[in-house]
Amino acid sequence: MKLQLMICLVLLPCFFCEPDEICRARMTNKEFTYKSNVCNGCGDQVAACEAECFRNDVYTACHEAQKG
């Protein structure tokens, strides 16, 4: 999984998961977009990137809070 994620991040221009402290900081930013929460434009690697992202419980909690 991590190898796939690294290949995705190195070879493709995708959006990847921010550190949870950045995510928390963005919770007060009305211009927040989900684009920064998940990988996008990674082709077949999107699912691997998302799985890596949401493995972090704090990050997941932030994502859920953003959905309201």
From Swiss-Prot:
Q: Which compartments does it reside in?
A: Secreted
Role description: Toxin that paralyzes insects. May have a direct effect on the insect central nervous system.
- Covalent S-S links between cysteines: 23-53, 39-49, 42-62
Tell what the record comments on domains.
Comprises exclusively 4 tightly packed alpha helices (no beta strand is present).
GO terms assigned for molecular function: toxin activity
Q: Does the keyword Disulfide bond apply?
A: yes
First-listed, main subcellular location of the protein, grouped into a coarse class = secreted
What is this protein's record name?
A: U1-agatoxin-Ta1c
Residues annotated as carrying Lysine amide in the record are 67
